[in-house]
Regions:
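N-terminal targeting or regulatory segments adjacent to alpha/beta-hydrolase or S9 domains
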Residues: 1-37, 274, 278-288
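Cap/lid segment of the alpha/beta-hydrolase catalytic domain
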Residues: 79, 83, 89-131
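Alpha/beta-hydrolase fold nucleophile elbow
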Residues: 144-155
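The feature captures the conserved acid-bearing segment of alpha/beta-hydrolase catalytic domains
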Residues: 188-249, 253-257
């Protein structure tokens, strides 16, 4: 169920973020740069004065360049964007607070992050993580080398939240992840990260109502109606995203994962290239 104050909750976050000076610092990482482009370590200040890190990759040549912004998955380590992608796009990969390279003063626990502060919508860690995602998008919109009309968001629920609150992006390639219908799925699963919810309820058996209330503010179905940009949703299995499709309230592209990094990667690259109008995508040799 969508909370009555859903919009005001997220508006408050944005208002808090506006008051924080981003203070960007961009330092080249020579070991990672190539003849095709440079790789930078980008530091930004996010909510609460927290410094976050992102890999910021800029190709050589005359810009502005289209952008692929990769929102992080659930895990401690974020990798540099793929080489082929970096050759003709600005490619940026965020390490949100708690992930490695953004882990001072807070180093996230895995498992554990998914329920950090979940007793209240105001203290849930993903409220601050959402601000990290928005901070990077706001940075991109200030960069002269960025083609502001061609920004593609790629990722799970963090990418969906960003698309809902930053409609300046052009496209969203979205894979529903751990927050989508999370407690319903956790009730029939013993696999992590969803098992983190079950662990939490075993430790705090009277907390279920509080957790349900918090997660309603982060449920993808409550964000979907706010996403107006061109969207591809890749679901785990056929029919898994039916409720999300209904929540979007419009036609979006939809596919089911092949459970193959090669086949899913080719499809993703081709869809993004078509939407950004960058021609045939450059793919890894072992994919061709």
């Amino acid at each position: 169920m969508k909370p009555e104050d859903f919009s005001s909750y997220w508006l408050q976050l944005e208002q808090e973020l506006i008051l924080v000076e981003p203070a960007p610092e961009c330092t080249e990482i020579p070991l990672r740069s190539t003849p095709e482009g440079k790789v930078f370590g980008l530091l930004l200040t996010s909510l609460g004065g927290y410094r976050i890190f992102a890999y910021y990759c800029v190709p050589h040549g005359k810009g502005p360049f289209p952008v692929i912004y990769r929102l992080p998955n659930y895990g401690s380590v974020v990798h540099i964007p793929p080489f082929e992608e970096r050759c003709n796009h600005i490619s940026i990969a965020l390490c949100h607070r708690g992930q490695r390279l953004s882990d001072e003063p807070f180093a996230a626990s895995y498992p554990g992050l998914l329920t950090q502060g979940i007793e209240s919508p105001q203290t849930y860690i993903y409220r601050a993580i959402a601000s990290d995602c928005l901070r990077v998008m706001d940075f991109l919109l200030t960069c002269e080398e960025v083609d502001h009309r061609r920004i593609s968001l790629v990722g799970g629920d963090l990418a969906l939240w960003t698309a809902a609150m930053r409609p300046q992006a052009l496209t969203l390639f979205y894979t529903p992840s751990m927050v989508y219908k999370s407690l319903q799925k956790a009730s029939t699963s013993s696999h992590y990260p969803l098992e983190e919810f079950n662990d939490y309820f075993r430790a705090f058996p009277k907390s279920r109502k509080q957790v349900e209330t918090t997660l309603e503010y982060f449920e993808p179905m409550n964000f979907a109606p706010r996403v107006s940009i061109s969207t591809m949703m890749m679901e785990e299995s056929e029919g898994d995203g039916d409720d999300l499709m209904a929540a979007f309230g419009r036609e979006i592209d939809r596919c089911t994962t092949y459970h193959s990094s090669f086949r899913d990667g080719v499809r993703q690259a081709q869809w993004i290239a078509d939407k950004l109008k960058t021609g045939e995508p450059l793919l890894p040799e072992h994919w061709t």
